[in-house]
Swiss-Prot record:
The keyword Transmembrane does not apply. GO terms for cellular component: ribonucleoprotein complex; ribosome. Keywords: Ribonucleoprotein, Ribosomal protein, RNA-binding, rRNA-binding. One of the primary rRNA binding proteins, it binds directly to 16S rRNA central domain where it helps coordinate assembly of the platform of the 30S subunit. It comes from Edwardsiella ictaluri (strain 93-146). The lineage of its organism: Bacteria, Pseudomonadati, Pseudomonadota, Gammaproteobacteria, Enterobacterales. This is Small ribosomal subunit protein uS8. InterPro entries: Ribosomal_uS8, Ribosomal_uS8_CS, Ribosomal_uS8_sf.
Length: 130
């Protein structure tokens, strides 16, 4: 059986991995997943990530903890295959009054809501991370 929403699966693996105090989580890799992992690393939500394998690449995320508690408090899928959510540059949401981030897929690539606002771009709201 094929996976219906690979991005939701990625977010769930991160959520479950941190709930179980895992050091790292692995998942099948894709360009979008790598772009999301890059944004999470830049914003300090994960420690690091790497891609292994050639035929079927596997993405490994090294999770981040602060004083024994997970850095990611909540991670939530917004736009999903059955209901895509697009926002213009002035409609981009502020997550937890600016404490969290919205991961946005724009015409210039995957970035945070802040970066999209500065670049004057709108796009698909992939997920919220706080």
């Amino acid at each position: 059986m094929s996976m219906q929403d690979p991005i939701a699966d990625m977010l769930t693996r991160i959520r479950n991995g941190q709930a179980a105090n895992k050091v790292a989580v692995t998942m099948p890799s894709s360009k979008l997943k790598v772009a999301i992992a890059n944004v999470l690393k830049e914003e300090g939500f994960i420690e690091d990530f790497k891609i292994e394998g050639d035929a079927k690449p596997v993405l490994e995320l090294v999770l981040k903890y602060f004083q024994g508690k997970p850095v990611v408090e909540s991670i939530q899928r917004i736009s999903r295959p059955g209901l895509r959510i697009y926002k213009k540059k002035d409609e981009l949401p502020k997550v937890m009054a600016g404490l969290g981030i919205a991961v946005v897929s724009t015409s210039k690539g995957v970035m945070t809501d802040r970066a999209a606002r500065q670049a004057g771009l709108g796009g698909e709201i992939i997920c919220y991370v706080a």
